[in-house]
């Protein structure tokens, strides 16, 4: 078997891993993870695409997603869960794609990247939006219910393109 075929077969067996990152990992990134998991399930890609989320700070480590985000997501039949965690050096090697929710987190993720070579692509979530000119997914933490709805609208928009992006990576 040629080495190209071996690599191709390995790609078919290994899932494409996506990490969503915001500041505290209690609002935007766990919601992005939940939206993406729902979309992946609906597309029948459970075995090909895996998702997780993390924060750039450790302040909320161990906490569940914000109850307001959980409620807003639940109203759309999307289930949030898990516990907040901080991004770590292994994430840069284990994930194929790291998506940040805003410019500050993008800069933080880049600055936290290990000096050694890492395999993850680091991109901004909003680069995948098709129905909005937004350049950041706003942090709804200090606002009202409408902020959580806006975040979910953006996440649902972007996740459609992210699935296609991941599909293209899996096929290669």
What are these regions (language model features)?
Residues 2-4, 15, 97, 103-172:
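Phosphate-binding/catalytic loops
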Residues 2-94, 164-172:
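Conserved active-site segments centered on acidic
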Residues 20, 99-100:
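Hydrophobic beta-strand core positions in alpha/beta domains
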Residues 29, 102-103:
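Helix N-cap/beta->alpha junction signal
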